[in-house]
């Protein structure tokens, strides 16, 4: 697995993806009434991450013909 100085091995393949994910994170947090940050519970912050994953999987399924993998 590739490793870089930041300790994060997730390499973005699409320019601008990080900004799009950050925007999605802020929109979902707003929908859920969650103020993201260190003072928020792990459960609340995690609910936002879980919803991001759910929406990204749904988006991928729709764009791949809706097939099960």
UniProtKB/Swiss-Prot annotation:
For this protein, the record's Pfam families field holds: SASP
Q: Where is this site: Cleavage?
A: 27-28
Alphabetically sorted, this entry's keywords are:
DNA-binding, Sporulation
Q: Which GO terms describe its biological process?
A: DNA topological change; sporulation resulting in formation of a cellular spore
What GO molecular functions are on record for this protein? double-stranded DNA binding
Q: What else is known?
A: SASP are degraded in the first minutes of spore germination and provide amino acids for both new protein synthesis and metabolism.
Report the function annotation for this chain.
SASP are bound to spore DNA. They are double-stranded DNA-binding proteins that cause DNA to change to an a-like conformation. They protect the DNA backbone from chemical and enzymatic cleavage and are thus involved in dormant spore's high resistance to UV light.
Family the entry assigns: Belongs to the alpha/beta-type SASP family.
Protein name, please?
Small, acid-soluble spore protein A
- Tell me the name of the encoding gene: sspA
